[in-house]
């Protein structure tokens, strides 16, 4: 039987990993072994980061809503409870956008939540 060599295949595979390591510092961009290890680690960090981004944005929206509601004499939790009682179904992202861009409309929503709390 003829001897089988995988030169082209191996080179292509290694080249693929080196290409993914573009922009890394030192041997992590040129050495196959180091590049492969770093790309695997980077992919793991990216996966975790995609999950954390959702948490970070939710907490940012909550901070913004809380900051906008405090001058009206409510805390974030009582405001959200008031919204629930008033049957207002607006997500936190939209509430935070309203608080920043349309403060008058946001104040109307706060007043409705206050009314629902007083009943």
From Swiss-Prot:
The keyword Transmembrane does not apply. GO terms for cellular component: ribonucleoprotein complex; ribosome. It comes from Mycoplasma capricolum subsp. capricolum (strain California kid / ATCC 27343 / NCTC 10154). Pfam families: Ribosomal_L20. This is Large ribosomal subunit protein bL20. Keywords: Ribonucleoprotein, Ribosomal protein, RNA-binding, rRNA-binding. GO terms for molecular function: rRNA binding; structural constituent of ribosome. GO terms for biological process: ribosomal large subunit assembly; translation. Belongs to the bacterial ribosomal protein bL20 family. It comes from the Bacteria. Binds directly to 23S ribosomal RNA and is necessary for the in vitro assembly process of the 50S ribosomal subunit. It is not involved in the protein synthesizing functions of that subunit.
């Amino acid at each position: 039987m003829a001897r089988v060599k995988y030169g082209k295949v191996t080179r292509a595979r290694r080249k693929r990993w080196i290409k993914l390591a573009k922009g890394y510092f030192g041997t992590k961009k040129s050495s196959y072994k180091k590049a492969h290890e770093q790309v695997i680690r980077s992919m793991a960090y990216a996966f975790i980061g995609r999950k954390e981004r959702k948490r970070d944005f939710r907490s940012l929206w909550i901070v913004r809503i809380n900051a906008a509601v405090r001058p009206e004499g409510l805390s974030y939790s009582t405001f959200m409870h008031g919204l629930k009682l008033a049957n207002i179904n607006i997500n936190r992202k939209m509430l935070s956008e309203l608080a920043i861009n349309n403060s008058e409309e946001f104040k109307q929503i706060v007043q409705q939540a206050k009314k629902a709390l007083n009943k």
